[in-house]
Amino acid sequence: MPHYQVVKGARDIFPDEILQWKHVEGVIHRLAALYGFNEIRTPVFEYTELFQRSIGSSTDIVGKEMFSFLPDPSGRSITLRPEMTAGVMRAALQKNLLAAAPVQKLYYISELFRKERPQAGRQRQFSQFGAELLGVSSPAAVAEVITFMMHVFEDLGLQGLKLRINTLGNMDDRKRYRDALRNYLAPCYEQLDDASKERFEKNPLRILDSKNPEMQQIVKDAPKLYDYLGREALDDFEKVLFYLSARGIPFQIDHRLVRGLDYYSYTAFEVTSSALGAQDALGGGGRYDSLAVELGSSGEVPASGFAVGMERLLIAMQKQGLFSDLDAAAPSVFVIVQQEELFDQALEIVTTLRRAGISAVIDLAGRSMKAQLREANRMNAANALFVGSDELASGKCTMKDLRSSLQDEYFLEEIIDKFRKPEPLNRLRS
């Protein structure tokens, strides 16, 4: 076994799997452009207090899962980002983006870090794609980010998805509900697990989000947040549902749904996949108008967004066989060197083809012609271009279509011209 191994909770992604990542990323980039979202990239680390203020001190992320350290000369703690929304909002406020354009539609595909117990689809270094729509508080804006997310899933071919949605109301609604929930849970306090006891004091709504079956049994008859909502939140939620229905997006109302981050208000949603088993969450999001105030803004910034775990997304697609038709990019031409002393001339041909925009490779190991052909077939090259003394003397090269086995002789300029025409090169004369 090699002396050095990959760090626990991280993983290597090799070329065969990179092909799958590129496919998914390509769909995301294409649909983001269709919806008018622009890509943003933020630093992988931020000051720790950014996440303490935004995510919430009662969350598992802040309490247990952040990678924090003290490299800054000022003594301020820095944290590898565990989520993207806080950093995106920080960047938007710092750059004053909304002054330039009152509506900002941003998306990202980024690396994140959490001290989680490594398991399938959950690593300590992981990737998310997501979107943030800033500057608009309307239900149509919430429906827009959900529609974008679901459109990505649809274009990727995913089946067995369920969109669960709820409203968390505004701050006053949640205060009334927190009081009612604490009153309900107080007689059961000693039966709560340690995490739920801590949440009881800081944010009892998080107990509803517990994955502990015993906690789920305790809260199954708890008051429903929906019963404590004011007219404003109810009307807002009904409009979100209306827009989703109008766009043909099926959903399931789940009054127990709360998100694991404290900054959400009004609409919250989550998407699950039947392909992921018991840990079925694929992604989710919601509205977070008050986040900007927590980060020092003088007023609220209307905002909605979502995040989806890329690793979990790929696992769901793999289990549904959605990558079976993907083929690695194959070279158009594999240049076969027939005599070792002709390598330099063959390399010049490869360079000429590449500069003409034609994908071309050459064997760099000095192997036999038979071994070169085997390598060309292994790489699924479309054509083999034979370079020998006879070919160089005549100024022509023999080109063989490796799929049809048809071949003919061509001047190099002819080969380049054929690749530039709409008809494929492999239509060679017998």
UniProtKB/Swiss-Prot annotation:
One record GO biological process: histidyl-tRNA aminoacylation
Q: Name one GO molecular function term.
A: histidine-tRNA ligase activity
Subcellular locations according to the entry: Cytoplasm
Disulfides per UniProt: none
EC numbers for this chain: 6.1.1.21
Q: What is its main location?
A: cytoplasm
Report the catalytic activity.
tRNA(His) + L-histidine + ATP = L-histidyl-tRNA(His) + AMP + diphosphate + H(+)
For whether the record's keyword set contains Methyltransferase, the answer is no
- Which keywords does this Swiss-Prot/TrEMBL entry list? Aminoacyl-tRNA synthetase, ATP-binding, Cytoplasm, Ligase, Nucleotide-binding, Protein biosynthesis
Q: One cellular component GO annotation, for this chain's record?
A: cytoplasm
Record CDD domains: HisRS-like_core, HisRS_anticodon
What is stated as this protein's family in its record? Belongs to the class-II aminoacyl-tRNA synthetase family.
HAMAP family tied to this protein: His_tRNA_synth
Which NCBIfam families does the record match to this protein? hisS
- The protein's name: Histidine--tRNA ligase
| Species whose genome carries this gene | Chlorobium limicola (strain DSM 245 / NBRC 103803 / 6330)
Q: Lineage of the source organism?
A: Bacteria, Pseudomonadati, Chlorobiota, Chlorobiia, Chlorobiales
The gene name reads hisS
